UniProtKB/Swiss-Prot annotation:
One GO cellular component term noted in the UniProt record for this chain: cytosol
Main location as per UniProt: cytoplasm
Protein name as catalogued: Ribosome maturation factor RimP
Keyword Cytoplasm: yes
Places the protein is found: Cytoplasm
Keywords from the named record: Cytoplasm, Ribosome biogenesis
């Protein structure tokens, strides 16, 4: 069964692309009785406030008609930022050679948090260089991952 994020991705992807943006990812978080639905959008040259407003209006209209969310919710639309979360293997592929931090669902070697240079991706396996050593992580075990920006 698809998650709410996957259902929303399928429902909203083409509409966001029609507005000239890429739907980078979706996060749904419960806070009390409300659900926060957070859409991250990106585009060549960066996202403007107007882009976020346009996407928010379009997505709100779609969600009002399709009604895929049973709970009360707040919609947020923003850029993924410099420390952007990575949602898909294609996104990881774009950041090979970059430093990332990964949080796992199930610990590997008694650790849930790994930070290192993303070396390569083969099938559903990511190889990080952590303290000079290769560490292989399974994509399906990743709960969350973010780019560590360079300044």
């Amino acid at each position: 069964m698809a998650t709410l994020e996957q259902k929303l991705q399928e429902l909203l992807q083409s509409s966001v692309e029609d507005l000239g943006c890429e739907l980078w990812g979706i996060e749904c978080q419960r806070a009390g009785r409300y659900l926060t639905v957070r859409l991250y959008i990106d585009k060549e040259g960066g996202v403007t406030v107007e882009d976020c407003a346009d996407v928010s209006r379009q997505v709100s209209a779609i969600l009002d008609v399709e009604d895929p969310i049973a709970d009360k919710y707040n919609l947020e639309v923003s850029s993924p930022g410099l420390d952007r979360a990575l949602f898909t293997l294609d996104q990881y592929q774009r950041y090979i050679g970059q430093e990332i931090v990964v949080h796992l669902r199930i610990p590997v070697l008694d650790r849930r948090k790994w930070q290192g240079k993303l070396e390569k991706i083969e099938n559903d396996m990511l190889t990080l260089i952590v303290d000079g050593q290769e560490q292989i992580l399974v994509f399906g075990n990743i709960q969350k991952a973010n780019i560590i920006p360079k300044f």
